[in-house]
Amino acid sequence: MESTEPTAPTGPAEFTAEEAVPVLRVEDAAAVVAWYGRLGFVRQWEHRFEPGFPAFVEVARGGVRLFLSEHTGDARPGTLVHLRVRDVDPVASEFGVRVEDAPWAREVELRDPDGNRLRIGTPTE
C-alpha cells in the first residue's frame, strides 16, 4: 500500500523564474490604471472571464510589474508595496507630497484610489 503522507522537503525547490509580482485589490481597474500611469506604469493586458466580470490587469514600468485585481479574494485593500527609484523627487513633485529623509532612504508614501500604499524611495549611500 502506498503512503499518502506528505514527504519532508529535501532541499530548496528548483525554479527557473525569479520574480515576485504583487497583486493589489482594486475596485475600478480602469481608474487605477490611469492613476498608476502618473507613476509611469503602462497597462500590459487585461483579462475578464466574461464581459461585465471583474478585471485582472497587469501594469508595468521597466522591469517592475504589478497585478491589479477586481476579484474580491485575490488580495486585501491597503497592501503596502515598496518601490525603489533612482530619484524620488519627481514622484514627490507629481503628487505634491514632501520627501521624508530616513537613514536608509529618501521616501514618499502614496495611496492609490483603493487605499493600497506605495512607499517609493531612493536608497541613501
Regions found by a protein language model. Give the residues of each.
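N-terminal beta-strand motif that seeds the catalytic metal site of vicinal oxygen chelate
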Residues: M1-A31, V81, T124-E125
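Residues embedded in well-ordered secondary-structure elements
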Residues: G11-A13, R48, V99
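Vicinal oxygen chelate
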Residues: E18-E27, V57-E58, H71-V97, W104-R111, ...
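Short beta->alpha transition motifs characteristic of CBS
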Residues: V23-R25, W45, D101-P103, I120-E125
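Conserved short beta-strand elements that form part of the metal-binding/catalytic scaffold
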Residues: R43-T79, L118-T122
